[in-house]
């Protein structure tokens, strides 16, 4: 009977039907478990049904036996043709023993409820609940009674026997296998260690890793070389990847993914309502999926994630926004351009310095040729180093000093008499070869006897030497002096630079850095030499503190103008004339004063001839001694100038002058306090010391009576 036109064929989802069938079976199984309890038989049947869904796990030893057998097959070993050859060495007992713990792992751990605990108490303890603390107390009391009943020797003997029994039990291999407590037992490897060994084994077969102990894998070496051969065909390569990478486990996952994709690709329609028990976990999961599907279908036209505020990172990696780095690129370009210009400027200055050095060396060569001095003081290595002002001045003084410009021969040169030299020739009036005296400075005249009528003649060109007519007699030979005088001399050019100016220009090309196309160099300036009124010996022998009192280090290193330096030089030269003041400051340079301390120090004085214990006058010099009085005859012989006569008179007037204020007596002379303070002494201290000495002198005679 034909189908009506408006009817559509009924489609059934086979995957969904299969899953629903499995779900119904599990639901029925759970209902039976709740009614009759969990039996071993039911657990075995459930484990068998679940094992079909789980992935098959191979034993590692079986995998190694499989790889060893495959290696022998690829190698075509003769053992594969033997009838009694065994390739899988595992026994049934070992397989059963290893399957038992695996089955135990698959079993679920059953929780202990209150009913189970009460049943256990009734069966084991007769329905009596005993606290753990009381039981421990009872056992401790029993142990105490037992230990108290035995002596010390008996206890030691009992301990030794128990230890001996324990050692014998550990040495017995049979007892250890039966469950005895062995002393040393082989440590069982953990799951992580076994998994790491299997992974290393697979990596070794792939050729990606080396194993430290390859002796146990000798039979698999051929299989490893065969699989790592670069000329391996496509089929063998697929088999290698399928086995080593366990592609067979991925097939089940791919099937599940395909089923899910088919469900998503279905035409959306009203969901199929199924009767599901809400108490089951899978039923709840199914209902949740149903609600999610209805929610997505009802709100499919709304904006997704409307309840959440979206935020975006500032820098998006996948953005197509163009970065504007023109300013950065411009700065880098400017920096590179300035660097290139600086390098080019340095190269130009280097070339200019080389040209200047060649010019100076050429001038040195000319000087050697003209002066005849091959060992001139300047060499090429003097121009290679950095500029040193002291070295430069030393070389200039050595090469072009007074000895160079003002050197005169001490003795008149003597030449051997040669034949053909006329004695009556006056060489002092000789003006050089081919020179006509004052007429050479003027232009030639047509009436001159030596006027050249040739139109191509150029008078500016040097004249050729006139050849003397060959004489029939003996040939005349010139003397060395005549040869030296007859050489052509370089004409002095007032516009030419001196050698010192050439060197200054050469060293001026040195620079520290280039800033804005301008070579920056440290400028040296010529300063006025100033010794601050001290000689070299005084500066080296004096103490640092004394030098600082004479002139501070800050003042010596100060940057001053030339006028200020001249003023300081003049002031310190006048200060150095005061020998007494220099003596007071530089006491380390006057050993005589150290031997005879003054009364200001409070120490006993030594009598010195000619001084009579008096303080050295300001006019006295350091280290000078008083001269002995001259005899009347010497006084008459030496005429005395008027200034020398006035000097003693001035001293006498100074003694007769009235001293204002309190005075201090030193060495039989009176000095005012202002005078002593000008000498750098403390007048109050000297005054009180003087009073103390006077008081001691007065008390001395009284104590003697």
UniProtKB/Swiss-Prot annotation:
GO terms for cellular component: 90S preribosome; nucleolus. Residues 31-63, 83-111, 125-197, 248-283, 305-348, 409-494, 592-705 are annotated as: Disordered. Keywords: Phosphoprotein. Residues 168-177, 250-265, 416-426 have a biased composition (Acidic residues). Residues 648-658, 684-705 have a biased composition (Basic residues). InterPro entries: Kri1 (IPR018034), Kri1-like_C (IPR024626). GO terms for biological process: endonucleolytic cleavage in ITS1 to separate SSU-rRNA from 5.8S rRNA and LSU-rRNA from tricistronic rRNA transcript (SSU-rRNA, 5.8S rRNA, LSU-rRNA). The modification Phosphothreonine is found at residue 91. The modification Phosphoserine is found at residues 93-95, 97, 135, 140, 162, 170, 175, 279-280, 308, 630. The keyword Phosphoprotein applies. Residues 31-42, 52-63, 152-167, 321-336 have a biased composition (Basic and acidic residues). Residues 137-151 have a biased composition (Polar residues). It comes from the Eukaryota. Belongs to the KRI1 family. This is Protein KRI1 homolog. It comes from Bos taurus (Bovine). The gene is KRI1.
